[in-house]
Every structure is written in C-alpha cells, then in structure tokens.
C-alpha cells in the first residue's frame, strides 16, 4: 500500500526541479559519460538506505531519552542564553527528525524523487548543523552520555547523506531517461520525425529537464 506524502504539491514540484537541475542539467560531466541505458525500469530503492532509516528510527527514541537525562543534569549550570538555545535546538531536532525519517522512507521505498530530495535537504540544512552545534560547542557542557549518543547519531546522518545523494542521483537520471524515451516512442508511433542526435541521451546538449520540465520526477 502506497504511503501518503506530507509534502504539498508546490513543494514537491520545487524539489523535483532542484533534483533535475542538479543531476540532469549538468552538461559538462554527465554528457561525457557513456552508459548502457535500457528502457526497462530497474529497482532503484536502496536497501542500505532503508536499513539506515530503520535503525535510525529505533535509535532516535534512545537519543531523546539520553538528552532529557543530560538536560536535567546540566540545565541549572547553563547560562540563560544557552538554556534557551539548547532547548530550542533539541525541540527542532526532534520535530524535524520525525518528518525527515518518514519522507526518507517514502522517497526511497516508493522511488519518489521529491520526498527523497526533501529528506536530503532536511538532513543537510537542519539536522547536521544542529547536531554539530550540540557536539562541538563546549559551552553546552557536553557530558560523556551526550558525546556517545551524538557520535552514533552523527554516523547515521553522514551515512544517510552519502547514500541518499547517490540514490537520488541515480533515480533522477533514470526517471528522466524513461520519460524521455517514452516521449520519443510516442513521436515515432505518430510518425513524427525525431532528430537522431536527440535519441542519444548521453550526447545531447539540451537537458531533458529543460525539454519536459520536472513531470517525470513527480511520481
């Protein structure tokens, strides 16, 4: 059963455009690569990423409990400014993590580019900076328990960034290629002349995203 996405249509469209611009419209490196593309659809979901998300989801409640314990121990020793800053950081991390893991699960398992792109953006722009702040700022009075759970969490984050980037790159190009080939087959079936150079995906100088927009990445 397909899971519902929490992302609005406009957000999904924007994320699809970002993914297309990053992984399809690169005319320097991508166009020079030689690949044996096939028209059939391959399974693009990543088992390592799904395993990371699964174990991350189980680990995160222990991370929250550990942070509550350490906050209770050191809260009175923090300055008023850092009490607010630390509390806000933990609340944001907790709220964003629930959304991040869900859209990462949906994006990877159901091969949805916008959700996977949103997962990567949330990881890079929110979770990773906040976690590094908690881990490196000595004025937070880092305790051994803090250090242990933060390091484990950081390993999850780093692995998910690398794997999701590679999966998103492969997924975006594959879907764009399938969409492009589908449109080419429609033109051929209607006896519309198709420029032979356009049928060679790796040598085309006009990006697929510019020709067809981000429709291929929305589903």
From Swiss-Prot:
<feature type="transmembrane region" description="Helical">
    <location>
        <begin position="147"/>
        <end position="167"/>
    </location>
</feature>
<dbReference type="GO" id="GO:0036038">
    <property type="term" value="C:MKS complex"/>
</dbReference>
<keyword id="KW-0966">Cell projection</keyword>
<keyword id="KW-0325">Glycoprotein</keyword>
<keyword id="KW-0472">Membrane</keyword>
<keyword id="KW-1003">Cell membrane</keyword>
<keyword id="KW-0969">Cilium</keyword>
<dbReference type="GO" id="GO:0035869">
    <property type="term" value="C:ciliary transition zone"/>
</dbReference>
<feature type="transmembrane region" description="Helical">
    <location>
        <begin position="51"/>
        <end position="71"/>
    </location>
</feature>
<feature type="transmembrane region" description="Helical">
    <location>
        <begin position="84"/>
        <end position="104"/>
    </location>
</feature>
<keyword id="KW-0970">Cilium biogenesis/degradation</keyword>
<keyword id="KW-1133">Transmembrane helix</keyword>
<dbReference type="GO" id="GO:0007224">
    <property type="term" value="P:smoothened signaling pathway"/>
</dbReference>
<protein>
    <recommendedName>
        <fullName>Transmembrane protein 17B</fullName>
    </recommendedName>
</protein>
<keyword id="KW-0812">Transmembrane</keyword>
<comment type="similarity">
    <text>Belongs to the TMEM17 family.</text>
</comment>
<dbReference type="GO" id="GO:0060170">
    <property type="term" value="C:ciliary membrane"/>
</dbReference>
<dbReference type="InterPro" id="IPR019184">
    <property type="entry name" value="Uncharacterised_TM-17"/>
</dbReference>
<comment type="subunit">
    <text>Part of the tectonic-like complex (also named B9 complex).</text>
</comment>
<dbReference type="Pfam" id="PF09799">
    <property type="entry name" value="Transmemb_17"/>
</dbReference>
<feature type="glycosylation site" description="N-linked (GlcNAc...) asparagine">
    <location>
        <position position="203"/>
    </location>
</feature>
<comment type="function">
    <text>Transmembrane component of the tectonic-like complex, a complex localized at the transition zone of primary cilia and acting as a barrier that prevents diffusion of transmembrane proteins between the cilia and plasma membranes. Required for ciliogenesis and sonic hedgehog/SHH signaling.</text>
</comment>
<feature type="glycosylation site" description="N-linked (GlcNAc...) asparagine">
    <location>
        <position position="195"/>
    </location>
</feature>
<feature type="glycosylation site" description="N-linked (GlcNAc...) asparagine">
    <location>
        <position position="26"/>
    </location>
</feature>
<feature type="transmembrane region" description="Helical">
    <location>
        <begin position="116"/>
        <end position="136"/>
    </location>
</feature>
<dbReference type="GO" id="GO:0060271">
    <property type="term" value="P:cilium assembly"/>
</dbReference>
């Amino acid at each position: 059963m397909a899971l519902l996405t929490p992302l609005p249509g406009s957000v999904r469209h924007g994320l699809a455009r970002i993914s297309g611009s990053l992984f399809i419209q690169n005319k320097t490196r991508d166009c020079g690569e030689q690949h044996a593309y096939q028209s059939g659809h391959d399974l693009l979901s990543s088992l390592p990423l799904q395993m990371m998300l699964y174990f991350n989801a189980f680990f995160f409640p222990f991370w929250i409990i550990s942070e509550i314990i350490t906050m209770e121990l050191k809260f009175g020793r923090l300055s008023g400014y850092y009490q607010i800053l630390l509390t806000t950081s933990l609340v944001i991390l907790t709220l964003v993590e629930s959304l991040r893991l869900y859209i990462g699960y949906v994006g990877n398992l159901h091969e949805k580019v916008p959700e996977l792109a949103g997962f990567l953006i949330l990881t890079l722009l929110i979770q990773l900076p906040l976690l590094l702040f908690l881990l490196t700022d000595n004025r937070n009075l880092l305790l051994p328990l803090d250090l242990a759970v933060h390091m484990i969490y950081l390993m999850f984050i780093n692995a998910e960034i690398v794997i999701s980037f590679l999966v998103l790159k492969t997924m975006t190009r594959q879907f764009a290629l399938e969409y492009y080939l589908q449109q080419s087959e429609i033109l051929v079936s209607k006896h519309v002349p198709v420029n032979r150079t356009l049928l060679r995906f790796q040598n085309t100088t006009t990006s697929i995203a510019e020709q067809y927009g981000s429709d291929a990445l929305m589903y």
